[in-house]
Each structure stands twice: as structure tokens, then as C-alpha cells.
Regions:
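Short acidic (Asp/Glu) and glycine-rich catalytic loops that position anionic groups and cofactors
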Residues: 98, 188-189
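Active-site-proximal cap/lid insertion segments
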Residues: 1-109, 122-129, 177
């Protein structure tokens, strides 16, 4: 339900909610989404196969990440609109670094801004060349990293209409700043 949410969410839902599409259109949207997902999985498999055939797989770091998620019916919405839900912002950042990665999963707050520092670290270069991100290499070893971020900031800069949003998320709370509307505070405990 969008009751109690910022009005922009209801306005967005007018055009991008499940009720905005017929069942046949939804079937097509869902099929296309999963079709793209399967295609990406297949193409990554092809890359991995070529690396294996060339004998370089054991020397190749592999990263799989996304810039945002997708509703595809979650919250009765479609696309990636002005809602700071985990469906959109809690996205995969998968890393395999040969000879380094030992952990199957980390709950650390990581971001795409960490990718350049990670690549520099793997290459043995100075990670301080990257001002904003941090290397995740030690996280992939399963190590606790001193001073690792306890929160994460996300931004939305409009999609289909101009709207700015900011989100500060910790393990326990999520604050969403909607400069043109009401703000949101969620207790995640």
C-alpha cells in the first residue's frame, strides 16, 4: 500500500503500477525481465568458458554488479521509480578474486564506487588514487575490515519526471529525504 508514503509514489503508480497494465502486458513484462536475466547469465557463462579455454580463468578476477534493481511487480509497481526500496537499491555485487576470495557472502555495505579501488588493489596499485571507494578485497577473504562503512548513501535523480531523493541506510534505520515532499524514516529492527 502507498498509504502514508510521499505523494510522488502514488503519482508514479498512476502510470507504472500493476493496475496500469493488462494481465497480458504484465506477462510480457515479466517474461522480458526474466529473458534479459537469462541472457545476461548465458553471456557471462560464455565469457567464463572462453577464459577457461584460454587457460586464464584461474588468473582472472570476475565482478558481477548492477546499478539498480527492478520492481517487476513488487509493491505492485514496475520499473525503477522514485521509491527507495531494497528491490531497487540492494543489488548484487559479486566478486571472485582467484587466490583471494574465500567467502560466499558478506553483509557489508558495498557500492559501485568500491570497484575502482578493488581493481587497483588486485593490480597492486595505490588504492588512494580513488578518493571515494574502498577495496573489497579483504571482505572477499572474510576478514573484518577496520573502519568499514556502517551506512550507505543512495541517490535518485529522476526517472520519467524530475525528482531528487537521497537515502541514508544503516542496519537499523533508513532515512529517505524527499526535498519536494515528506521525508521517510523506517525502523528496520
Amino acid at each position: 500500500s502507498l498509504i502514508g508514503k510521499p505523494p510522488i509514489q502514488e503519482n508514479y503508480a498512476t502510470y507504472w503500477s500493476t493496475s496500469s497494465f493488462t494481465n497480458e502486458q504484465w506477462k510480457k513484462l515479466i517474461a522480458v525481465y526474466w529473458g534479459y536475466t537469462a541472457m545476461i547469465d548465458f553471456e557471462i557463462g560464455r565469457i567464463m568458458d572462453v577464459a577457461r579455454e584460454l587457460g586464464i580463468l584461474d588468473d582472472t578476477a570476475v565482478f558481477f554488479c548492477a546499478d539498480h534493481g527492478e520492481f517487476t511487480g513488487s509493491h505492485r509497481l514496475n520499473d525503477k521509480g522514485p521509491m527507495m526500496y531494497d528491490d531497487i537499491y540492494n543489488v548484487p555485487f559479486i566478486a571472485h578474486i582467484p587466490g583471494v576470495s574465500t567467502v560466499g557472502r558478506s553483509d557489508a555495505f558495498v557500492s559501485l564506487i568500491d570497484l575502482p579501488a578493488t581493481v587497483l588493489d588486485i593490480a597492486g596499485l595505490d588504492t588512494s588514487l580513488v578518493e571515494d571507494g574502498r577495496s573489497i578485497v579483504d571482505l572477499t577473504r572474510g576478514e573484518d575490515v577496520e573502519g568499514w562503512r556502517e551506512d550507505i548513501v543512495c541517490e535518485f535523480h529522476g526517472h520519467h519526471f524530475p525528482l531528487q531523493q537521497r537515502m541514508l541506510r544503516t542496519r537499523d534505520f533508513k532515512l529517505v529525504i524527499n526535498p519536494e515532499s515528506i521525508n521517510e524514516l523506517y525502523d528496520l529492527r
